[in-house]
Amino acid sequence: MLELRGKKVSDGIKEYVSKELETLSFVPKLAIVRVGENPDDMSYERGATKKLKSFGLDVASYVFPQDISDEAFKKAFKDINEDDEVTGILLLRPLPRTINEKYIENMIDPKKDLDGISPINIAKVFAGDTSGFSPCTAEAVIEVLKAYDIELTGKRVTVVGRSMVVGKPVSMLLLKENATVTMTHTRTVDLKKTCSDAEIVVAAAGRAKMLNSDYCGQDAVMIDVGINVDENGKLCGDVDYATLDGKASAATPVPGGVGTVTTAVLAKHLIQAAKMR
């Protein structure tokens, strides 16, 4: 079984970023906006900061207390959004319930919205319009498949998960690549058959080791987007990776797979935002 490691893909994106940086007259700056001290958010923030800085890009974190009022956060976010020195924004979600997240999604400048959360960018993804930004994780899936020369045209692809972060947008991106896409979720009847009939499975349900080799057709490709913690406190995906050998032709590990590419896509989007200016 071929291990689809994200480092190779990330290195390819880094090359693109380095070349494009040379053509710019300034260093693009990413604003990471975080509310509260959620360990997952903080971990992602550290990883993204480290990756983008290693790519030669500028990163600034804007951290607000968990109990910030809706009004105060709207004002602070407006200032970041309108700051000419900020090239792109990554808003770590979900926000506390006291903050109107929909309002913020509508407020963010689509040209700075690097993770594709604004209604305009979401509409572009669903329309097959590549002039906007798609969610980084969804795009990372496509980057992995392309980097390893995995053909998508005409292929049967099953996507497990229907979130606006991964499931729905990745389905649209796969359709744009001429794949034949089946969208499923945890309530799909006979999920096992739908997955095992596919040539490529994208697992994005958010349930630890939910899919084992029974969900994998012979020589299928398994792309695991899940980031979970197993019963031993170890990081794992939605796919039970250890069961795949002898069944899958290729699979992404967790950690070291799609997640590694997600932050590289964020860097690529920052460069693209800089070029739009």
Locations of the language-model features?
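Short beta-strand elements in bilobed, periplasmic/extracellular small-molecule ligand-binding domains
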Residues: 52-66, 181-183
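Short, well-structured alpha-helical segments in soluble
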Residues: 72-84
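Short beta-strand segments enriched in small/hydrophobic residues
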Residues: 27-37
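Anion-binding alpha/beta catalytic cores of soluble intermediary-metabolism enzymes, centered on
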Residues: 88-152
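Glycine-rich phosphate/diphosphate-binding loop of Rossmann-like nucleotide-binding domains
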Residues: 35-49, 132-221, 230, 234-245
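Short, well-ordered coil/turn residues at beta-beta hairpins
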Residues: 92, 204-205, 224-225
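Rossmann-fold NAD(P)-binding glycine/threonine-rich loop
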Residues: 102-123, 223-277
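Positively charged, low-complexity intrinsically disordered leader regions
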Residues: 1-26
